Amino acid sequence: MRLLNSLAIAISMYSKIPVPTVDWNEKNMKYAMCFFPVVGVITGILQFGIGYALLEYTSCGKFFFAAVMSLIPVLVTGGIHLDGYADTIDAISSYGDREKKLQILKDPHTGAFAVIGLCVYFTAVLALWSEAESYMLPIAACMYPLSRALSGISVVSFHPAKNSGLLRTFQDGAQKKRVRIVLIIWACICGGIMLYLGWQQGGAFVAGAAAVIAAALLVFVYYHWM
């Protein structure tokens, strides 16, 4: 039951999927981050299912397909990651000291650099999805739990920017060593599946899957450095 409560906390926090309300107490928070990749699994399944249906059973254009695929993660998560991304772009682009960046992160207003960053993000995502074919979708679907596994590892491994806030709540409540092991297993499984699917498609796809995994790891390292 406790693990189900942890699952409910993870899904309710990082998605708009309705789940039963549970108490955010110490026992329920211990393993909540273990289930962060579950949100990615749900997103990936929706991406694969809807994307495959659009490409194989409809005559929709590339732009419509790309727009739908770009919006699915936003609708599933409620935009929580985009909100953090926009705040981070504003803070980094200020080139201020640590205190100024933290102040910008707390500011509810959206700055010019956040708008520019979001425009760049959606332009890139639209462009990438416009080139997708149905046989690419399984590998693409695995990226969502992989990214959340790496994000969860950072939560229980890296020092927080400040000593308060929602992220600190998840850090303080987690059984860090066990959660880290579970998330590493998640990441290895996702990476392994991506490489296997690439191998089934041929050598070029193995290289492509490896490149995606490498890019995710580079972002993870950059996040630690940042």
Regions found by a protein language model. Give the residues of each.
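Glycine/small-residue-rich loop that forms an oxyanion/phosphate-binding "nest" at active or ligand-binding sites
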Residues: D83, S93-S94, Q103
